[in-house]
Swiss-Prot record:
Record-level GO cellular component terms: chromosome; cytoplasm
Subcellular localization(s) per the UniProt record: Cytoplasm; Chromosome
Recorded consequence of changing residue 43 to A: Decreases DNA-binding
BP terms from Gene Ontology: chromosome condensation
Impact after mutating residue 40 to A: Decreases DNA-binding
This protein's name: DNA/RNA-binding protein Alba 2
Gene from which the chain derives: albA2
Membership in a protein family: Belongs to the histone-like Alba family.
UniProt keyword annotations, A-Z: Chromosome, Cytoplasm, DNA condensation, DNA-binding
Length: 102
């Protein structure tokens, strides 16, 4: 991936603007040119929303350098005690300040 070793922002269930602030803080205050936004399952749409808000409203010099998608098979227990296999999708979005390659 293009963002090897870059700081990560993991997306969860909090409001989108919390993650927008986390992405901006990571890019502006930690002295890094790149950040990786990661999400799994139902939080993928929240990750995409956060990245687009950062790019279109706050920091127009941010570019999407790479996007990696994947899915994993996870075994879960049902309430009846049976084991089921579920697929969980994941996404990693690498962001970089334009013109400042690492």
């Amino acid at each position: 991936m293009a963002c090897e070793g870059a700081p990560e922002v993991r997306i969860g269930r909090k409001p989108v603007m919390n993650y927008v602030l986390a992405i901006l803080t990571t890019l502006m205050e930690q002295g890094t040119n790149q950040v990786v936004v990661k999400a799994r399952g139902r939080n993928i749409n929240r990750a995409v929303d956060a990245v687009e808000i950062v790019r279109k409203r706050f920091a127009k010099n941010i570019e999407i350098k790479d996007i990696k998608i994947d899915s994993q098979e996870i075994e879960v227990q049902t309430p009846e005690g049976q084991t089921r296999t579920r697929r969980v999708s994941s996404i990693e979005i690498c962001l970089e300040k334009a013109g400042e390659s690492a």
